[in-house]
Amino acid sequence: MTGMQMEFIRKMPLPQELLRDYPIGADLKRRKAERDAEIADILTGKDDRLLLIIGPCSADREDAVLDYMRRLAQVEAQVRDRLMIVPRVYTNKPRTRGVGYKGMLHQPDPGKGEDLLAGIIAIRELHTRILRETGFSCADEMLYPSNYSYLSDLLGYVAVGARSVENQEHRLVASGLGVAAGMKNPSAGDISVMMNSIAAAQSPQEYIFRSWEVRTSGNPLAHAILRGYVDNFGRSHPNYHYENLRELFELYGEYQLANPAVIVDANHNNSGKRYLEQVRICKDVMHSRSLSDDIRGLVKGLMVESYLEDGAQKVGEGVYGRSITDPCLGWEKSRELILRLAEYE
């Protein structure tokens, strides 16, 4: 193609072709719809349970992720009257320099090269197996907006990351999603960028999507995710403290957005990627909720990076259930945290 330095490797299947070849049955569709409604009720204040989005930084291998999900389902049964658990199953990962492991979408086997056709099948099969075997519909990051259609019948929650939140395509596509969309504050920390992103996602939009001109009605479930930020010198700063939450509450009023809500990401720059800090940060946020009805009403949930083993490893080191991207809280600590969060009033 003229003017492009690209090798066109192969044509990818259309979303409707993949959904036809790898379908889900009526029972799974019904289960997802039930969970979608529960998430919506939490974000709109009809359900006062806490939303807990928890799971690996990256879903790197099917066996370990499914092992984690089965354990999570057992704990969820003990706390479902107080918490709604939405597993993190992030199958594509942004990379600061564009190199390194980019997730299961790119590399279904982290030890082998990139294969996006196999990857798009692998991530659909993974989300399907989790829904079928545990009843969980999951959260994933919308890194590539046009790929959302491959998983649109499976995902219960979508996050727009710190690197993507300023991008117009991400904002416009988020406005057309039928599920909750969390918009993270950008890496540099400008909260107005996040608020403008929420405003765009909540508004009706027209744009080009997968070769179609489309029109949306806006997504009233678009909301904030606070994940900390980095300053001009690359130093991490948190934004989960009471005063940050109070400021966000006031901003929601100024912007006059629907359904004021925030999820606090306990890792990333809020923890300075010191993954063990996530436990303390979650407790701090829960304490802030107890101090103010405004903050309690605003903070709808928490996001935690958690896997089977503590910490992180390099690709190829081979420790089962240990993250190959950001360090995560191990299973026992995660289980204890979930049970503790369920005790808060």
Q: Where does each model-flagged region fall?
A:
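Conserved phosphate/anionic-ligand binding catalytic regions in large, soluble enzymes, centered on
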Residues: 51-64, 326
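Glycine-rich loop at the start of a catalytic domain that most often binds anionic cofactors/ligands
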Residues: 62-74, 97-105
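Acidic (Asp/Glu)-rich catalytic clusters
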Residues: 43-46, 73-80, 129-133, 216, ...
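Active-site-facing alpha/beta catalytic cores
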Residues: 2, 10, 82-247, 268-273, ...
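Long, contiguous binding/interaction regions
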Residues: 29-32, 60, 133
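N- or domain-start disorder-to-order transition segments that initiate the globular core
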Residues: 2-44
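Conserved, mostly hydrophobic/aromatic
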Residues: 55, 264, 330
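Internal helix-turn-beta structural module
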Residues: 307-345
